A protein has these predicted regions:
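Conserved hydrophobic helix-helix packing surfaces used for dimerization/oligomerization
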Residues: 8-10, 31, 515
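Glycine-rich loop(s) and the adjacent beta-strand/alpha-helix scaffold that form part
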Residues: 23-26, 30-55, 243-247, 256-330, ...
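FAD cofactor-binding and catalytic pocket of flavoenzymes
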Residues: 83-102, 106-109, 113, 119, ...
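A glycine-rich dinucleotide-binding beta-alpha-beta segment and adjacent secondary-structure elements
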Residues: 198-215, 237, 242-249, 389-394, ...
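Conserved N-terminal glycine-rich FAD pyrophosphate-binding loop of Rossmann-like flavoproteins
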Residues: 38-64, 103-112
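Conserved redox-cofactor binding core of oxidoreductases
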Residues: 57-84, 89-99, 104, 114-119, ...
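A conserved FAD-binding loop/helix module that cradles the flavin
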Residues: 525-543
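Beta1/beta-strand and adjacent pyrophosphate-binding region of the FAD-binding site
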Residues: 2-16
Length: 552
């Protein structure tokens, strides 16, 4: 247990926790990072084959990963990076499944992040002013611009400057090349009046080496590593953050209560600043427990809306094949940068103004289509048509905030006696109409590129696992349940008025300003872009503001 005093406690060590810790430590602040999971080595975290495959089988048979196995990333990464659902349970209504992916280890879900880095535009930040749904954000792109730029430079993000209103340009290095089949699709789409194809923006695929064992997109390979190098950071792993400690008049937090998961002991840790980066649902549970705490008074939420307006991105997927333009040889063996990654892929970035088909759009807000061709092909002898290359398109769209979609505390408690989160979330008519439009544009784009849509199991032979893969949510025609896209957002939104938001424009709890809420829970709307870069930019901005003398 740490004995030295700390000036800040950061809860969570993933994408936002790493940036919070780096920002504070580089400014001279002594930081304690609280992480519920273990501190793994890079070799332990990444794993290897066939051991990872054996762990997947065990995770499925034991029930450890019953829900998380629905996500394609589970089949790509070491299953050890997905929390045991029996140890960290949650509940849902029977008719409202929610697929919560939990990354409980130092590095959190940054170790399984796909590495796409997109900025939000004011079309998203101020969408409510345009259509009247919900509230606009209290910040704009200009407020985050410098923080976006600093992070893009630090991470050496790949991408073009495309000059799109719906996708602001960043400080990027050269984009990764399209595969030959992607080049063919891009050329075919140039004949379309309203379907534009751009290089995706993000990280390239990680190639582990002794010099770079961690993925640069992960906090252990970037922000957290930089923070630890200052000598002002200590990581307390294996401890679950339960709730805030409050002062007598409930105006400020004095620290947090954590649970040592080895023995269940509750420990009080004190610091003048608390930064909450535990991921949306875990952070909402922490805040709900803190709000209701009888022994310490709890903090006040004037809006009485904590936990409400939970969102994810609504998504749907189509697999297809196109004639190979590069023979049967593996492109990835010839060029490792051609592996599927945040930068090794493409976007059809429709944004808030998708092309109209058959009259006015039957939904509000927007979406993008992310895709790739010839970046994840199995060996040619496993393909049903070995002279074709495989592709996919995945839509991810903005979800309207709904008062009914929420996280509450269940009457059921976990092994440490803490109420588990109860998640109530379902798609509405707007999301259903958006998904139908996604299908129309997917079909159109793939047809223009000479592709043929088929179920993945009709494209690839999968000995032994075909029955499992065929039943995955990603294989179904419609939209998977909320949580599937691992972009859960909202529940403690930013705002300009304490009566309709949980945190202010600097991410401070309205009635407890030395607590910052900076992960996805602070989002006012979901936007349509991949959220992680914006989460990190919000975190950097909030932590820099907290360091100013007037906030001491």
């Amino acid at each position: 247990m740490p004995l030295k005093p700390f000036e800040a406690i950061v809860i969570g060590s993933g994408a936002t926790g790493g940036v919070a810790t780096q920002t504070l430590a580089e400014a001279g602040i002594r930081v304690l990072v609280v992480e519920s999971g273990p501190d793994l080595s890079a070799q332990e975290a990444l794993g290897s084959e066939p051991i990872n495959s054996m762990r997947r089988v065990r995770g499925l048979l034991s029930g450890q990963h019953r829900n998380q196995a629905q996500h394609p990333g589970y089949w790509k990464h070491n299953p050890r990076l997905y929390a045991d659902e029996r140890r960290y349970p949650y509940s849902t209504p029977k008719d409202q499944p929610f697929l919560w992916t939990q990354g409980r280890q130092v590095g959190g879900r940054s170790l399984t992040w796909g590495g796409i880095t997109l900025r939000l535009s004011d079309l998203e930040f101020k969408a409510a002013e345009r259509d009247g749904h919900g509230h606009s954000w209290p910040i704009s792109h200009q407020d985050l611009d410098a923080h976006y730029s600093a992070l893009e430079r630090q991470f050496a993000i790949h991408g073009n400057r495309d000059g799109l209103a719906q996708l602001p340009d960043g400080c990027t290095t050269a984009p990764l090349s399209f595969t030959p089949e992607e080049q063919q699709l891009a050329a075919a789409l140039q004949g379309s009046a309203d379907i534009e194809m751009i290089h995706s923006r993000g990280f390239s695929a990680h190639q582990p080496s002794p010099k770079c064992p961690w993925p640069p997109s992960s906090s252990p390979g970037s922000s957290l590593k930089t923070a630890l190098s200052t000598g002002r950071v200590e990581v307390l792993s294996g401890h679950l953050a339960e709730r805030l400690l409050m002062n007598r008049d409930r105006s400020r937090a004095s620290g947090v209560v954590v649970i040592d998961q080895r023995n269940g002991e509750r420990i009080k840790l004190e610091a003048p600043l608390v930064v909450l980066c535990a991921s949306t649902i875990a952070s909402l549970r922490f805040l709900l427990l803190s709000e209701r705490s009888a022994t310490e008074g709890g903090f006040e939420d004037p809006s009485a809306s904590l936990g409400r307006h939970l969102m994810d991105h609504v998504s749907t997927c189509r697999f297809f094949q196109v004639p190979s333009r590069s023979g049967r040889a593996s492109l990835q063996e010839l060029d490792p940068t051609s592996q599927l990654s945040g930068a090794g892929s493409f976007f059809l970035p429709f944004g808030s103004l998708p092309p109209q088909r058959s009259g006015a759009l039957p939904f509000s807000r927007g979406y993008g289509l992310w895709g790739a061709i010839n970046r994840f092909d199995p060996p040619w002898w496993l393909k049903r048509n070995p002279d074709c290359r495989l592709g996919f398109l995945i839509g991810h769209g903005e979800v309207l905030p709904s008062h009914q979609n929420r996280v509450t505390l269940s009457e059921t408690v976990d092994r440490w006696g803490v109420p588990i989160p109860h998640i109530s979330c379902r798609w509405g008519t707007n999301e259903t109409a958006m998904v139908a439009h996604m299908h129309t544009l997917m079909n159109e784009a793939i047809a223009l590129g000479g592709g043929e849509i088929q179920p993945l199991t009709d494209l690839v032979m999968m000995p032994l696992i075909e029955p499992i893969v065929g039943n995955l949510e990603a294989m179904k025609a419609g939209a998977p349940p909320p949580g599937y896209y691992v972009h859960e957002l909202g529940g403690a939104p930013m705002g300009n008025d304490e009566n309709d938001s949980v945190v202010d424009s600097w991410n401070r709890l309205w009635r407890c300003p030395n607590v910052l809420v900076v992960d996805g829970s602070c989002w006012t709307t979901s936007a349509w872009q991949s959220p992680t870069l914006t989460m990190m930019a919000i975190t950097r901005r909030a932590c820099q503001q907290a360091l100013r003398p007037e906030n001491a």
